[in-house]
Swiss-Prot record:
Transmembrane feature ranges: 1105-1128
Positions contributing to Ca(2+) 3 binding: 592, 596, 600
Cystine bridges: 66-73, 105-123, 654-711, 770-776, 847-864, 998-1022, 1027-1032
Principal location class: membrane
Listed GO CC annotations: cell surface; external side of plasma membrane; extracellular exosome; extracellular space; integrin alphaM-beta2 complex; integrin complex; plasma membrane; plasma membrane raft
Name of the protein in its database record: Integrin alpha-M
Signal peptide positions on this chain: 1-16
Cytoplasmic side: 1129-1152
GO BP annotations, alphabetical order: amyloid-beta clearance; cell adhesion; cell adhesion mediated by integrin; cell-cell adhesion; cell-cell adhesion via plasma-membrane adhesion molecules; cell-matrix adhesion; complement receptor mediated signaling pathway; complement-mediated synapse pruning
Residue numbers covered by motif GFFKR motif: 1131-1135
Annotated Ca(2+) 1 binding sites: 465, 467, 469, 473
Family, as annotated: Belongs to the integrin alpha chain family.
A UniProt-annotated Pfam family: FG-GAP
Amino acid sequence: MALRVLLLTALTLCHGFNLDTENAMTFQENARGFGQSVVQLQGSRVVVGAPQEIVAANQRGSLYQCDYSTGSCEPIRLQVPVEAVNMSLGLSLAATTSPPQLLACGPTVHQTCSENTYVKGLCFLFGSNLRQQPQKFPEALRGCPQEDSDIAFLIDGSGSIIPHDFRRMKEFVSTVMEQLKKSKTLFSLMQYSEEFRIHFTFKEFQNNPNPRSLVKPITQLLGRTHTATGIRKVVRELFNITNGARKNAFKILVVITDGEKFGDPLGYEDVIPEADREGVIRYVIGVGDAFRSEKSRQELNTIASKPPRDHVFQVNNFEALKTIQNQLREKIFAIEGTQTGSSSSFEHEMSQEGFSAAITSNGPLLSTVGSYDWAGGVFLYTSKEKSTFINMTRVDSDMNDAYLGYAAAIILRNRVQSLVLGAPRYQHIGLVAMFRQNTGMWESNANVKGTQIGAYFGASLCSVDVDSNGSTDLVLIGAPHYYEQTRGGQVSVCPLPRGRARWQCDAVLYGEQGQPWGRFGAALTVLGDVNGDKLTDVAIGAPGEEDNRGAVYLFHGTSGSGISPSHSQRIAGSKLSPRLQYFGQSLSGGQDLTMDGLVDLTVGAQGHVLLLRSQPVLRVKAIMEFNPREVARNVFECNDQVVKGKEAGEVRVCLHVQKSTRDRLREGQIQSVVTYDLALDSGRPHSRAVFNETKNSTRRQTQVLGLTQTCETLKLQLPNCIEDPVSPIVLRLNFSLVGTPLSAFGNLRPVLAEDAQRLFTALFPFEKNCGNDNICQDDLSITFSFMSLDCLVVGGPREFNVTVTVRNDGEDSYRTQVTFFFPLDLSYRKVSTLQNQRSQRSWRLACESASSTEVSGALKSTSCSINHPIFPENSEVTFNITFDVDSKASLGNKLLLKANVTSENNMPRTNKTEFQLELPVKYAVYMVVTSHGVSTKYLNFTASENTSRVMQHQYQVSNLGQRSLPISLVFLVPVRLNQTVIWDRPQVTFSENLSSTCHTKERLPSHSDFLAELRKAPVVNCSIAVCQRIQCDIPFFGIQEEFNATLKGNLSFDWYIKTSHNHLLIVSTAEILFNDSVFTLLPGQGAFVRSQTETKVEPFEVPNPLPLIVGSSVGGLLLLALITAALYKLGFFKRQYKDMMSEGGPPGAEPQ
């Protein structure tokens, strides 16, 4: 057999931490299945299973021992028992270190019993010397099960079956007998109706074992259906020794009927218990439509053995009987396993013992996934001869096909061992059960179920002692067929339950995205502490990733007895070798195979086994110390004769490389190349300090360091004046480390710890001006005013200024800050400084706004820094802060503005550090009242006219502002002049449906001599006439709302004769009033809230038309006479016909 050992150097590194992928050792064999299983032993040995290798005729599977020290593999010679036919040795492996033991199993031993072949298993327990012959478990294969069967047919011959169907039923019986016929099976047959006839007994069949010759002569009885009586007769007469029934044979009754029993004197309750006592296994076949009702189906269930789903067949007609022939045959074949009560199932005939295996303190634990109809279980061997079978069938009847024992793990709690078994096909979702021993009996005390159908939850198990205290903390449960759209497989992290608490899984581990068929979790192993944090790490295989090339994931343990949810390293098989397939299908870890004191990982692939070494883990400690500890004031304070480039001090930088892992490597052998960068004030646009050597704020250094401390001293300078002497100068150090390969240990390379601190900082503070006690005690105060502003008008100018004065009467104040609190409808706009008398220096102010909450309600705040970072002692600053007022703001009747001043000196607050001021608030309104064009503009009358005319004055009122408010509209209307009515009972009406209330009162004129006033101006208004004042209160006048108000009444003319004017103007006025304590008009808008309307009134004389008519008639006649005389004189009226005839041609001439 060819043997090759390859030392692979990966073309590209598998990024991660911290298994060495550059120098992976690969063992390769041509044996089929090599790498299917793998286990580490003490020393440098690895045992590999090749369960598919054909060793000899009827011998399959072999074991190989591979040694890191020799770099070779050799087969383990084993005397395989003759009965171990095709056992697939090496399909499962298990090992312990104390004492050193190896358990190797072949769970596919083929055992032939008569015409049946069963699958069992054998395991071999080795000691530390694999050349010595191992112990065998079980000591011998269990014998073949009982196979004698007596099968009786009870067929319905009642009159409801037509002859053609009866013949089909006989053909069905003959065919089934032919299929079940073998040397240890006997048949008998009874026909029943209301009569009963035994056509042949077991003894007669034994004498003539020809089914067709026995069945063909049978004729139909006809009559009613007495099924219950027929069953009793079969039990008592056919299953009788006198008729050839055998004492130790299985008793099987097959009942074929086409309907419910009818006219039978016996009930099923009279005969079924007797059949159960006699151990008769009953199958019933219901034919036809009669069994569609619930009652008839219940009759079939009553006849059949339990459970009915395994013993009842139902077909639509006799033609369909042939469709169930094979099903019935399989059911009866299954009986020849083991009989239990009235039903039957396999016990251990298909057990596949050793499908998974573990070594307990009591002895080997071998799983039997095929036991009891593949419900599964395990055998715990305390000696070769003594074993205990452990399963869940007694407590969970629905364990069929669960495969309990598919995976097994041992847990240790309080020095007591318990078992954890996986059943990945339990109810299709999978189950993992925990078993403990109680008074000598093993019982399940906790379980956890899967969540996805077909995920194979429990296909792999791994118990983990995270903190290495000797007690198991959690169990990893693999579900390699768990499916998501972008990844396949998952591993649940399940801490052990405490007390009687429910067992739950509190976390789930996944592989990388993009691998839906990855089978992540197909293999699990405890790796040990590979990163030096004293916590156990684990490895998880995903052999289906990258098109079955495979990958292995490394997860670190975490404090609190958990597993990190993200992997620290992913090792792809394709990166190690392009020929690898199913890399990660088996895993084993936790042993030091390379004799360097570090644990190693063994990974199985198809035809290959790879040994991956964990690497020494390093950490770096950095110390940076300044001398002096502070930058002196005379160095950083600038004056008129400033000198640049002053030396600020020096810093001592020390690096100490330390090893975290426990190993056998000598400290003097470990070296690494460390490159570190130093940066001063790296977060600032301009550094305040530089290195004297480079005149730059950064510096890079590369050194080869061992496991010792290395130091260097660097001088620092301040190149410019310091604007910020408060924040210390920050020196940052970050580094990278590359380990030097160790030639004495196969070029093993140290690595930097994954969670190692890579960034270090040190602070170089500035000396403070804080007196001898070095504690700065400022004395801050704040005041402010609204300057000349007496009232804030909302809706007027959008901005207003607040003049603020801040003083410091104490020592230097650090990071002084003024904070204003103001209503939400205000917003900060800008800040500007004012020159004051105490200081001529310029100040740095910067403000920013933020939301804040005070006890009184929601407020906004703006904070202004005063000359950051230092507000010097005995200083005063005055500045304006400008606020913007929303035109729709609602501030009440007063604006309350608060402010305080604070600093990082942490001095207690006083009444000087807080200030507040109130300012009255009014709201600007913009309203207009105008005279409408539809008002009466002109009226006239005659002196003799005693009637009155209707006159109206209309006004349009508009709210053009941004406020709704209540208003009053006041009209002044002249109604009497010198006790004579002018405008009689004027009324006010509105164009809109306004809610208003109007009331009137009279107002006396201001001048009593109205005639004198009229001579000055022909105007009748409230100065000379008695007026009616009409006030209409409107409670709500909305934004952009307008309406018309109309004054309407009768105008009398009697008063006019008391005047001597040709015309007069009647004037009414309208004015808008409002609450001026809340609202106000902007300057220049007062004229728009008042208006007046004028109507011109004048008298006229009615003319007499008679003189005009008479005069016109006489004048017309005289004019006509004159015209006629003139025409006569001119001869207009003379006849001239004769002249016209004489001027014509001779008589009789034709006209021309």
